[in-house]
Regions:
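Intrinsic-disorder/low-complexity linker and hinge segments
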Residues: 17-19
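Short, positively charged
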Residues: 24, 28-162, 170, 174-367
Length: 367
């Protein structure tokens, strides 16, 4: 005969079972119950929904990634695993199949927020998509894949194309934080610039009937000819020493510019310019306005880079302190962004023994 304790135990078990049913959700696949999860387990529910959505749209997502030139099954799988986490897959695929985002639309907009709005991706996944890259030769930098995926007519370049990404068959360059204004061609050996600048001063002195300073004996430190944010290096030291003996004339400074441009053309291969590194920059007393000198030199470098690479435009991508993207389609737009403080010089040209071809150029990044 059942005791009072037996009834109490059965009643408690029945209550627990009822409570369990109320607190859980069944997970079914094709009518088969695979198990249960707690109603409060929002994370697992989201993962299951993502898996179901991903499975339903896997072919479409992977087909899109293949069409825009994502190389290799591993990379396509990585892209799929990111995109499958969209909370609105129909909206995401609708956008990817009819992309509308233009380069000009990126200025002032947070790329993570744009990705969330257009693809309905969680913020953490949108960030992963923004910085998604892989090892390759030449390297695939952060932001390049995101731009190829999000922009109207965006694609990855094929083996016959030299841009970092393509928009409607036009080549675009992408520069991340601290990237150098230099490409794969058109630049000489930065280490030799010490010799070229030294030679420029010697030739200049000979042209104006002056004796070159005694300290130009080749024994200086390898960074002596570097011109940074505050120091004009041996160039500034040489000019001030010469002007101390006898001030320059405007004609002298015009000749100096000729020799300086000639020196830089040894690094910026086949470079010609009408810009002057001395007019309004170097005083008759030999003092260099370093800010003006670097601003003109930056314009020379960028113009050479643009003409050599023949790209449609350049994207600057920032992902360290803040997520930003800026598009520039002309030298004027780039320099305007520099002058307005949107772009800053992250590093100045270095001509040391450790400098490679790109080390002799300016490094830039968004502010």
């Amino acid at each position: 005969m059942a005791t009072q304790g037996d009834f109490r135990a059965r009643f408690a078990a029945a209550l627990n079972e009822a409570k369990g049913k109320a607190d859980t959700l069944e997970v079914q696949l094709g009518g088969e119950v695979l198990g249960k999860i707690l109603k409060t387990d929002v994370k697992t529910q989201a993962e299951i929904k993502s898996a179901v959505n991903g499975a339903a749209f896997e072919a479409d997502i992977k087909s899109f990634l293949n069409e825009i030139g994502i190389p290799g099954d591993d990379n396509i799988e990585t892209g799929f695993q990111l995109l499958r986490q969209s909370t609105k897959p129909e909206q995401m695929l609708g956008y990817l199949n009819s992309r509308t985002l233009l380069p000009k639309d990126l200025s002032g907009n947070d790329p993570i927020s744009l990705t969330q709005d257009l693809l309905a991706l969680p913020a953490n996944v949108a960030k992963k998509l923004f910085i998604w890259s892989w090892k390759s030769t030449p390297s695939t930098g952060r932001g390049e894949v995101w731009l190829s995926l999000m922009l109207k007519d965006g694609k990855r370049p094929d083996s016959t194309q030299k841009g970092d990404m393509m928009i409607d068959k036009a080549e675009w360059e992408v520069k991340g934080d601290g990237a150098r204004i230099a490409g794969q061609k058109g630049f000489g050996d930065a280490k030799q610039m010490r010799h070229h600048l030294n030679t420029a001063i010697v030739k200049f002195c000979g042209d104006i009937g002056r004796k070159a300073p005694d300290f130009l004996d080749g024994s200086a430190a390898d960074n002596a000819w570097n011109i940074g944010k505050k120091s004009a290096g041996l160039l500034g030291k040489s000019l001030e020493a010469l002007a101390k003996e006898k001030k320059f004339t405007k004609k002298d400074l015009d000749k100096l510019n000729t020799y300086l441009v000639e020196a830089y053309s040894k690094y910026l291969l086949n470079f010609t310019t009408k810009l002057s590194l001395t007019k309004g920059v170097v005083g008759l007393d030999g003092k260099i306005n370093i800010a003006k000198y670097n601003r003109i030199l930056l314009e020379m470098y960028y113009t050479h880079y643009e003409n050599t690479e023949e790209f449609k435009g350049i994207f600057l991508v920032s992902y360290t302190n803040a997520n930003k993207v800026l598009a520039c389609t002309t030298t004027k737009e780039f320099l305007s962004a520099v002058d307005s403080g949107k772009i800053k010089i992250a590093a100045y040209p270095s001509f040391t023994d450790a400098a490679g071809a790109q080390g002799g150029s300016f490094a830039i990044q968004l502010v």
